[in-house]
Curated annotation (Swiss-Prot):
Keywords: Auxin signaling pathway, Cell membrane, Membrane, Transport. Coiled coil: none annotated. It comes from Oryza sativa subsp. japonica (Rice). One of its GO terms (cellular component) is plasma membrane. The keyword Iron does not apply. GO terms for biological process: auxin transport; auxin-activated signaling pathway; positive regulation of auxin mediated signaling pathway. InterPro entries: BG1-like. Residues 150-163, 195-209 have a biased composition (Low complexity). Residues 137-146 have a biased composition (Basic and acidic residues). It is found in: Cell membrane. This is Protein BIG GRAIN 1-like. Belongs to the BIG GRAIN 1 (BG1) plant protein family. Residues 1-32, 120-163, 179-235 are annotated as: Disordered. It comes from the Eukaryota.
Length: 337
């Protein structure tokens, strides 16, 4: 028993001195034991190297995050987006930022192009004086360019698209300003005098009687030595025709002929059976045969069917008489065409 205790307790000091005992069989070491021994050795021997490696990876990660933040700030800022697009691509097609990849060389190039923004007045009065002198030196050049190219600023302003708000504001200003464009009359040329307007006195029934005609005296052209002959002044006369007057007078002057127009006056009796237009008039053949026998006066109504509206007794008598042209019941009048 004591020998067994001595055998188990003997390798303990060596294990404490080495740190961890290697569990390895002297004859046939297994794969798991070999892997475990390698892991333990790497942890014991490379403790300090692992710490430095972790610190280096953390620093590299921080630098990468900072570069990414600068990259996205520079790309999505509206004032710098155009310059970023115009910058030449330094990397390959795989490093193109449009495809979602990132290139540190592009970020360094873009960051070098950024200008520092001064946020505090720590520069002192010397820097302000230098800037003022620089502006004074640059001002004559600006004035010269403005004089040589007066239309460049206006053309640049015209190329800018107007926003809807600006258009609405200009429209409201033009409405409420109260300035209306004055109607400019075209200037008459001195060679051709303005014609005078003379009107004939129209009748009282004319619709144009109350419209005055502005008569102006012809302007005398200026006498110059270059004009060979003076042009005579011509006057034009405007006359208004009386619309409501007698048209027959104008027609007679124009040589129009009269065409007679007949207007037949129909005798209408309310409630009379003779002028009835009902369908029962078609069945009055017996009474009509008694009044106008077969053959009639000229034998024209014997075997005919009655016509609608002509089966009355009085109407058939009137038709049989055949009144001459211009009889009393008819009224004739003439119309000029």
């Amino acid at each position: 028993m004591r020998d067994m205790e001595m055998r188990w307790a003997a390798p303990a000091p060596a294990a404490r001195g080495r740190g961890r005992a290697r569990r390895r069989a002297p004859d046939q070491p297994s794969f798991s034991s070999t892997l475990l021994d390698a892991i333990c050795d790497s942890m014991d021997e490379g403790g300090e190297d692992g710490r430095t490696r972790n610190a280096a990876s953390a620093a590299a990660k921080k630098r990468q995050e900072a570069a990414n933040s600068y990259h996205y700030y520079y790309c999505y800022k509206p004032s710098l987006a155009a310059s970023y697009r115009a910058a030449p691509a330094l990397g390959s097609t795989a490093d193109c930022p449009g495809r979602g990849y990132f290139s540190s060389s592009e970020v360094e190039y873009s960051l070098r192009r950024l200008r520092p923004i001064r946020t505090s007045a720590a520069g002192g009065a010397g820097d302000g004086a230098a800037v003022a002198r620089k502006q004074r030196h640059e001002q004559p050049d600006v004035e010269k360019t403005a004089k040589t190219k007066p239309g460049s600023a206006s053309a640049r302003a015209c190329r800018r698209p107007a926003s809807p708000g600006a258009r609405l504001a200009s429209l409201l200003n033009s409405i409420f300003s109260g300035k209306r464009p004055s109607a400019q009359r075209p200037a008459c040329s001195p060679d051709y005098p303005e014609p005078a307007c003379s009107t004939a006195p129209p009748s009282s029934s004319s619709s144009y009687a109350r419209r005055p005609c502005h008569a102006k005296t012809p302007r005398t052209p200026p006498t110059t030595t270059t004009t060979a002959r003076a042009r005579p002044s011509r006057s034009r006369t405007v006359r208004f025709l009386d619309i409501d007057g007698k048209v027959a007078v104008a027609a007679a002057v124009a040589g129009c002929r009269r065409i007679p127009v007949m207007e037949v006056e129909a005798d209408t009796d309310d409630g009379g059976e003779e002028s009835s237009d009902a369908s029962s008039d078609l069945f009055e053949l017996d009474s009509l045969a008694a009044i106008a026998p077969a053959g009639g006066r000229d034998g024209s109504y014997g075997d005919e069917l009655p016509v609608y509206g002509t089966t009355g007794v009085g109407i058939r008598r009137d038709i049989g008489r055949r009144r001459p042209y211009g009889h009393a019941p008819c009224r004739s009048w003439s119309r000029a065409v």
